[in-house]
């Protein structure tokens, strides 16, 4: 017998006998049948060496080659297995044997197993087994085997032919179980399977049952694999074959081990879509007749009959292959395709586990061969780009054994019929670079269906989803699913996103129905005993009334029994009707809720609270922004249009430009809108345009281009809107930005979308864009003196003059195409002195809130408020000087007093001025403390 190594060695786990080099090499040298790596045992006898002048040299070379090739099967042996083999040689030498027989290998296994239960939990120890073996060895010495010399090592003893067959079967067992190692349990299984007379005699004398020992060994192997979380697929289903004679050779074991024929590549890696369609496991395919006809037309060609479906994810490429399978199952195809089968290839399963060099290519060639031999198979490869360009030998770089190169010849000759499917981007990356591969496929473009076609598709699938979710989808719900998904989920394609919408809506409705039933059952358990007794008495009274009426009005004749029986039958019918659950109805409101959860956009129907909020939105904004009614009305009108659904769906909610003097509330109005309608001020995305003054900073909005630092990272504007599409985007002080930013804004204002540096389209259709600008503030300040702002003109005429001045400045600064895309340009009015008191109340309310967090109250007299307004008013600077006055006259004074310990939690501070006009501060209803009023210029 001879063993050779046909592949490179596998990685050996750390717990194996990594340091058994010398011992393993010596054993291998004496055996002549153990090699390094994955061993394959050859079942032919050694040919006699040729006789001649150079015969000795040939024999020496063969021996050297055999030693080099068979350097150690023991590298696959675990540490325990190598130890058992070495111990078996020691036992053979101790018994005076000239070769290691199977019984000596059994002694080595028994000596290696030092567990408390003995060898394989049988209670057998080495001393007892050695004594029994001595008597057997005296009768069954290996004929012709030389006795070992006294000075030789145990590892110099060779292995008998029977022992080599044990190793051979152990290797087969390991391979069939899917193991990458050989343990003592594998050797024991092989030893018990071989029908060796001396081994059987030894086991009988020890009182052991070989089948029971084999079962224990197999259990230990499975437990060891499960403990390491790496149990291979064949270990759990492995069964020990029946015993065969020791001289039967390798063929007997090959037949017994491979009695169950392995699955072919088609059955292992493919799913028969035609069988699935015949069994009704494929959903009905609605539409796509043109695409399916085009696929059939390509398949019926003589050569290059391989269609490739190209389209975005979710448009229904796989459905076209399933539709063709349905047609074949129904016989609605040309006679050429009646006997064909559509087999869907699982690319992930094909690639998974191909860890050795060339194993993936071997699987692909086997698959191609089986398809060619079958003759009736059309292979469907979904996501074909995962397979093209892969390959362990060529590293996916187009080398000789690249998978694409393996497919080209059979595809060109028509031996392999294939329907491929991939996206347009992946086709450009993998197929267009390889012209030879691309011309073997005929492209079929699969477009996204229209909304009308998507509604038809959902109507065709409605029954399937109603059966699964045990609910009813109304026609309005189907239409809403298509409309809402098309408008508010722009990053996915129809019909996939609409199908997912009704699927999740049905799931949500079913869960809510379950929760309602659970709450009803809980409420029954929470009832008091008195309530139960009241219900019982009411039922008894009703029963008595019904019984008396039956006795009173039922006839006395013989058919009276039938008259009495009729009400009971009616009662049974009523009970059966009550037991039938009412179907769950999924309408537009349920669809809208799910769409809102997906997109973060409130698209459900307006509730009473929503209507109240929208109607009172103007008033809420006026509470925070004083004296800017025009701007408040403009921004509230835009929000109302969007919420009702009357705004243009292809543009942002509104694009507004706020202009005017500084400090009049342009940014504050945007913050107020975010807090009042969008939930909080954090819902606002604020970009300070002073950070984008240089040309190279413009790209930060959409992401850096290739070759620049930051490429691959997300853009500041695009990523924030993509994550949170329903938001307010504030471009603060837009005039400070570089003019190139206006080119980016043109597309957002007009088309409602923008592509980032990664090529992803980001929708701005649900954002409200507000730009603020101080353009014209200098001219306003000058014009107020030169144009008569302080004359006796009315306020309206002054505002009209100021607005005209600002509009001229805007037209001079911005390009006409940008101004023409802005929905509304609002010029804020300058703040009057009479409006400062209302603004002061808002500022003081914020100060009171911060003091309340410290446990201290604050009251400010009217005289003190007048003093603050007097010192904090400047028409050129708006309300910001007023905030500085509050900081100086109130916050600074109170902080000093708190630090000196004059006020503690629970006190209330009263801020006032005395008769001399000086600032004073006191506890409420206590002694007044006068303070000198420090002067400060605002």
Swiss-Prot record:
| Region spans: Disordered | 234-255
Where in this protein does the record put region II? 586-777
For this record, an example GO cellular component is:
chloroplast
Task: Specify where the region named Repeat 1 lies, as residue ranges.
Answer: 84-145
> What residue range does the UniProt record give for the transit peptide?
1-83
Annotated GO biological process? cellular response to heat; positive regulation of response to salt stress; positive regulation of response to water deprivation
Additional comments on file?
Plants overexpressing CLPD1 exhibit improved tolerance to drought and salt stresses.
According to the UniProt record, where is the region Repeat 2? 159-224
Role played: Molecular chaperone that may function in heat stress response. May interact with a ClpP-like protease involved in degradation of denatured proteins in the chloroplast. Chaperone involved in response to abiotic stresses. Plays a positive role during dehydration and salt stress.
**What is stated as this protein's family in its record?**
Belongs to the ClpA/ClpB family. ClpD subfamily.
A Gene Ontology molecular function term of the record: ATP binding
What name appears for this protein in its UniProt entry? Chaperone protein ClpD1, chloroplastic
Query: Which tissues does it occur in?
Result: Expressed in stems, culms and leaves.
Q: Where is this region: I?
A: 266-519
Chief place where the protein resides? plastid
Residues the record lists as binding ATP: 311-318, 660-667
């Amino acid at each position: 017998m001879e063993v050779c190594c046909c592949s490179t060695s596998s990685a050996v786990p750390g717990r194996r006998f990594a340091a058994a080099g010398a011992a393993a090499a010596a054993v291998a040298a004496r055996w002549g049948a153990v090699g390094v790596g994955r061993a394959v045992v050859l079942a032919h006898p050694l040919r006699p060496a040729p006789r001649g002048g150079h015969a000795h040299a040939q024999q020496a070379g063969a021996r050297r080659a055999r030693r080099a090739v068979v350097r150690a099967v023991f590298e696959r042996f675990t540490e325990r297995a190598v130890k058992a083999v070495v111990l078996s040689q020691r036992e053979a030498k101790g018994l005076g044997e000239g070769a290691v027989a199977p019984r000596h290998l059994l002694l080595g296994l028994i000596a290696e197993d030092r567990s408390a239960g003995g060898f394989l939990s049988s209670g057998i120890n080495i001393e007892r087994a050695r004594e029994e073996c001595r008597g057997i060895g005296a009768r069954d010495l290996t004929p012709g085997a030389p006795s070992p010399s006294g000075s030789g090592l145990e590892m110099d003893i060779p292995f008998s032919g029977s022992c080599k067959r044990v190793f051979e079967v152990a290797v087969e067992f390991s391979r069939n179980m899917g193991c990458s190692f050989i343990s003592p349990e594998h050797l024991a299984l092989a030893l018990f399977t071989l029908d060796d007379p001396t081994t059987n005699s030894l086991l009988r004398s020890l009182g052991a049952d070989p089948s029971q020992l084999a079962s224990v060994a197999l259990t230990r192997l499975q437990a060891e694999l499960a403990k390491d979380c790496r149990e291979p697929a064949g270990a759990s289903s492995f069964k020990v074959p029946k015993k065969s004679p020791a001289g039967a050779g390798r063929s007997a074991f090959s037949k017994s081990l491979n009695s169950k024929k392995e699955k072919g590549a088609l059955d292992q890696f493919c799913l028969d879509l035609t069988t699935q369609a015949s069994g009704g496991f494929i959903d009905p395919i609605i539409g796509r007749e043109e695409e399916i006809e085009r696929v059939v037309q390509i398949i019926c060609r003589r050569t290059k009959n391989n269609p490739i479906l190209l389209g975005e994810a979710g448009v229904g490429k796989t459905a076209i292959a399933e539709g063709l399978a349905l047609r074949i199952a129904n016989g609605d195809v040309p006679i050429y395709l009646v006997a064909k089968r559509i087999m869907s290839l699982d690319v992930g399963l094909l690639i998974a586990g191909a860890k050795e060099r060339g194993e993936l290519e071997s699987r692909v060639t086997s698959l191609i061969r089986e398809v060619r031999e079958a003759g009736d198979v059309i292979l469907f490869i979904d996501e074909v780009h995962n397979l093209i360009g892969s390959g362990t030998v060529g590293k996916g770089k187009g080398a000789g054994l690249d998978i694409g190169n393996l497919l080209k010849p059979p595809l060109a000759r028509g031996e392999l019929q294939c329907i491929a499917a991939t996206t347009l981007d992946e086709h450009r990356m993998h197929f267009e670079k390889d012209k030879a591969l691309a011309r073997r496929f005929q492209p079929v473009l699969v477009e996204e269906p229209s909304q009308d076609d998507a509604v038809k598709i959902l109507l065709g699938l409605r029954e399937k989803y109603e059966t699964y979710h045990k609910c009813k989808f109304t026609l309005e719900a189907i239409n809403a699913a298509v409309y809402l998904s098309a408008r508010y989920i722009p990053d996915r394609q129809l019909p996939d996103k609409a199908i997912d919408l009704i699927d999740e809506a049905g799931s949500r409705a079913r869960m809510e129905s379950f929760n309602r039933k659970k709450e009803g059952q809980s409420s029954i358990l929470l009832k008091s005993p008195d309530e139960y007794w009241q219900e019982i008495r009411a039922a008894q009274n009703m029963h008595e009334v019904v019984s008396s009426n039956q006795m009173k009005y039922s006839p006395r004749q013989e058919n009276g029994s039938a008259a009495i029986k009729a009400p009971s039958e009616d009662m049974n019918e009523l009970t059966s009707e009550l037991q039938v659950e009412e179907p769950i109805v999924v309408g537009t409101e349920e669809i809208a809720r799910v769409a809102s959860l997906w997109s973060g956009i409130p698209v459900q129907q307006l509730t009473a609270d929503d209507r109240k909020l929208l109607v009172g939105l103007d008033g809420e904004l006026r509470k925070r922004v004083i004296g800017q009614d025009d701007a408040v009305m403009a921004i509230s009108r835009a929000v109302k249009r969007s919420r009702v659904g009357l705004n243009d769906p292809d543009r942002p909610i509104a694009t507004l430009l706020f202009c005017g003097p500084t400090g009049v509330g342009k940014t504050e109005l945007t913050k107020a809108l975010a807090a009042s309608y969008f939930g909080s001020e954090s819902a606002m995305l604020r970009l300070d345009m002073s950070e984008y003054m240089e040309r190279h900073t413009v790209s930060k909005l959409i992401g850096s281009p290739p070759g620049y630092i930051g490429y691959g990272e997300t853009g500041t504007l695009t990523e924030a809107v993509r994550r949170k599409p329903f938001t307010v985007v504030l471009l603060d002080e837009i005039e400070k930005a570089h003019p190139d930013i206006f080119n980016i804004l043109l597309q957002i204002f007009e088309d409602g979308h923008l592509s980032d540096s990664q090529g992803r389209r980001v929708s701005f259709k649900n954002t409200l864009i507000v730009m603020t600008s101080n353009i014209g503030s200098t001219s306003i300040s000058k014009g107020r003196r030169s144009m008569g702002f302080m004359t006796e003109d009315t306020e309206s005429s002054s505002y009209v003059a100021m607005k005209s001045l600002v509009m001229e400045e805007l037209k001079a600064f911005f390009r006409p195409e940008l101004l023409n895309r802005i929905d509304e340009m609002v010029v804020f009015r300058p703040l009057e002195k009479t409006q400062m008191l209302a603004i002061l109340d808002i500022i003081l309310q914020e100060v009171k809130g911060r003091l309340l967090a410290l446990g201290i109250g604050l009251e400010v007299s009217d005289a003190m408020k007048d003093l603050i307004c007097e010192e904090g008013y400047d028409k050129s600077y708006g309300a910001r000087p007023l905030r500085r006055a509050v900081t100086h006259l109130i916050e600074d004074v109170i902080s000093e007093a708190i630090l000196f310990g004059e006020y503690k939690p629970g006190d209330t501070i009263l801020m006032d001025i005395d008769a001399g006009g000086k600032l004073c501060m006191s506890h409420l209803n206590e002694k007044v403390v006068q303070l000198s009023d420090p002067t400060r210029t605002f």
